[in-house]
Swiss-Prot record:
<dbReference type="InterPro" id="IPR011033">
    <property type="entry name" value="PRC_barrel-like_sf"/>
</dbReference>
<dbReference type="GO" id="GO:0005737">
    <property type="term" value="C:cytoplasm"/>
</dbReference>
<dbReference type="GO" id="GO:0005840">
    <property type="term" value="C:ribosome"/>
</dbReference>
<keyword id="KW-0963">Cytoplasm</keyword>
<keyword id="KW-0690">Ribosome biogenesis</keyword>
<dbReference type="GO" id="GO:0042274">
    <property type="term" value="P:ribosomal small subunit biogenesis"/>
</dbReference>
<dbReference type="GO" id="GO:0006364">
    <property type="term" value="P:rRNA processing"/>
</dbReference>
<dbReference type="Pfam" id="PF24986">
    <property type="entry name" value="PRC_RimM"/>
</dbReference>
<dbReference type="InterPro" id="IPR009000">
    <property type="entry name" value="Transl_B-barrel_sf"/>
</dbReference>
<comment type="function">
    <text>An accessory protein needed during the final step in the assembly of 30S ribosomal subunit, possibly for assembly of the head region. Essential for efficient processing of 16S rRNA. May be needed both before and after RbfA during the maturation of 16S rRNA. It has affinity for free ribosomal 30S subunits but not for 70S ribosomes.</text>
</comment>
<protein>
    <recommendedName>
        <fullName>Ribosome maturation factor RimM</fullName>
    </recommendedName>
</protein>
<dbReference type="Pfam" id="PF01782">
    <property type="entry name" value="RimM"/>
</dbReference>
<dbReference type="GO" id="GO:0043022">
    <property type="term" value="F:ribosome binding"/>
</dbReference>
<keyword id="KW-0143">Chaperone</keyword>
<feature type="domain" description="PRC barrel">
    <location>
        <begin position="90"/>
        <end position="163"/>
    </location>
</feature>
<dbReference type="InterPro" id="IPR036976">
    <property type="entry name" value="RimM_N_sf"/>
</dbReference>
<dbReference type="InterPro" id="IPR002676">
    <property type="entry name" value="RimM_N"/>
</dbReference>
Length: 166
């Protein structure tokens, strides 16, 4: 069964076994809900509790009552089984579906491909790796991202002034 990456453990939080997670999912409330099963470092863990914290989520797992039991997860990616994907409406997509998509401008010129996505307080930001190896960051907002086409594996953007320094 395929696994989807939904975040990374950034650090521990306090001494009671909570982990600070940088999430990479549009559904953190569902992904980190009580009794959800997550995979970290090859281990299946069950969420005991979770809560938003600044731009992160704090998650505590069953049978992991103190910091000593969770320190080993620092820096580890967090996965779910693909079968647990939520149903999406027309025009919606998962972050995992856009990684690797070709990025073009409105004239069809190639810009690069999506290498990563991360959440900020205001909106998501996509990292685009250009053919010359440089990376640019674009906000996922209507003024920039014009079309996401999963069928053709392309994203059309309007590259506003200042987004690409080349």
């Amino acid at each position: 069964m395929k696994e989807l990456r939904i975040g990374r453990v950034i650090n521990t939080h306090g001494i009671a076994g909570e982990l600070k997670i940088d999430f990479n999912t549009d559904f953190p409330e569902q992904r980190f809900a009580k009794n959800s099963e997550l995979l970290i470092a090859g281990e299946k863990l069950v969420v005991q509790s979770s809560r938003p914290f600044k731009q992160f989520w704090l998650v505590k797992f069953s049978d992991h009552e103190n910091i000593n039991l969770v320190e080993k997860y620092k820096g580890e990616d967090i996965f779910i089984n693909e079968r647990k994907e939520p149903r999406l409406s027309e025009g919606e997509f998962l972050v995992s579906q856009i990684i690797g998509l070709k990025v073009i401008d409105e004239k069809g010129n190639s810009i690069g491909e999506i290498a990563d996505s991360f959440h900020t307080g205001a909106n998501d930001v996509w990292t685009i790796k250009k053919s010359n190896g440089k990376e640019i960051l674009i906000p996922y907002i209507d003024q920039v991202v014009k079309k996401v086409d999963l069928q053709t594996s392309t994203v059309t953007i309007e590259l506003l002034e200042g987004l690409d320094e080349d």
